[in-house]
Amino acid sequence: MANTQYAGTGRRKVSVARVRLTPGSGKITINNRSFEEYIPAANLRAVVIQPFAVTSTDGTYDVNVNVVGGGFAGQAGATRHGIARALLQVDPDFRPALKSAGLLTRDSRMVERKKPGLKKARRASQFSKR
């Protein structure tokens, strides 16, 4: 029997998430740890499960994610992007819903680099008139 697996790669900031969907009960595993253990913040957990809410596929697929780089927010965004791309492989009819929710677009915003002569990217040292 062929084991149906759907894969998707998601990226956000410097994080990269490799996502595998298999038909199941809705169990999410990230880096071999449970979803709740890996992402303790409720707002970031909501970000991760957003593609399932948009496509009404809550609890129908088990998710196995390998995510590297970045922090919690970047990894959550990368995981969401990967899940959305994997759901497209499950059913191409999900594209309009995912596209209108903005889940298929790679968020291109990156950290602005620090400039020489400044303390941070835009923060200059305090100006003294005299």
Swiss-Prot record:
One of its GO terms (molecular function) is structural constituent of ribosome. GO terms for biological process: translation. One of its GO terms (cellular component) is cytosolic small ribosomal subunit. Residues 116-130 have a biased composition (Basic residues). Residues 106-115 have a biased composition (Basic and acidic residues). Pfam families: Ribosomal_S9. PROSITE patterns: RIBOSOMAL_S9. The keyword ATP-binding does not apply. Residues 105-130 are annotated as: Disordered. Belongs to the universal ribosomal protein uS9 family. This is Small ribosomal subunit protein uS9. It comes from Oenococcus oeni (strain ATCC BAA-331 / PSU-1).
